[in-house]
Amino acid sequence: MAHPNEDLIRKGFNAFSTGDMEALRNEFLAADVKYHVPGKSPISGDYNGIDEVLGFFAKVFELTRGTFRVELHDVLANDDHAVVLSPASGQREGKTLHDNGVLVFHIKDGKTTEVWLHPSDLYASDEFFS
């Protein structure tokens, strides 16, 4: 049987992949969630609160004209955290992104409270989104 936080992550990834922002808002993200995106691109930075995080997701979809995709390769979960191995891809202005990222989730009371995104190639990610 999977850990409850693994189930939460799998449901969250499914909601993200299908564009179900209401499920992300109501079932996956805490109201005061923090999301950290490294780098120097226009999307890099810290997003605070559910509206900023969902706005970040919308910006990624907008910049890639809906081509951005994530896969859930694997999830490692315990009572406080989940670590996700997640290939991502997208198209933007003639550029293609293929990245094997890692995301670290802090989870409390069945909701994601903080996320740290770690692209495998930060330089390529910055170039793609710049």
For each feature predicted by the language model, list its residue ranges.
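C-terminal and inter-domain tail/linker signature
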Residues: 1-130
